[in-house]
Amino acid sequence: MKVLIAIGASTLLVSACGQRAEDEGDRSATSRVAAGATAAAAAAPLGRAVSGARAKQIMHVRHEGMESIGDAFKVVGREIKSDNPNVGAIRTAAASIDRLAQQSGGWFPPGTGPNVGKTRAKAEIWQKPRDFAAKDKAFQLAAREFNAAAVSGDIDEIRGEATDLDKACKACHDAYRAPKH
């Protein structure tokens, strides 16, 4: 994220060179930085390429993160099906899912695909980076909303948001996750 902000700020500074303030109309500096950051994100939605030991490290972090999300979601599934759900266990699992989901955008830089090592991440992730990034953002949002529902303690709301989170996971996994090896 810091890289995108820096790129956006650089884009703003370069685009502003030689222009007087009144030439900018009513576009604020904030909106110009946001536009630059958005353009930078669109140009490289999965981040900068990595290789070697760094690629292997990211792949390991990705694998462990996804395993942890899966383990936490198993707790959620068990509890929401229970006649007497343990909301505390759901809250803990939801917080873990949300925390990890917010990190997931950095788990798929170019150079961490199936040609590098064992992974269930399909090559299509890097062939369709904008679609993948959009699905990842939807997952992050669903995880955030699920966590908010868990904090509320309302089991019906928790169940509804768990369904939405499951759909977000499935949308990405159906397109971008290979079967187990």
Regions found by a protein language model. Give the residues of each.
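C-terminal motif of bacterial Sec signal peptides marking the signal peptidase cleavage site
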Residues: 14-16
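Bacterial lipoprotein signal-peptidase II cleavage site
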Residues: 18-26
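The canonical Cys-X-X-Cys-His
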Residues: 165-177
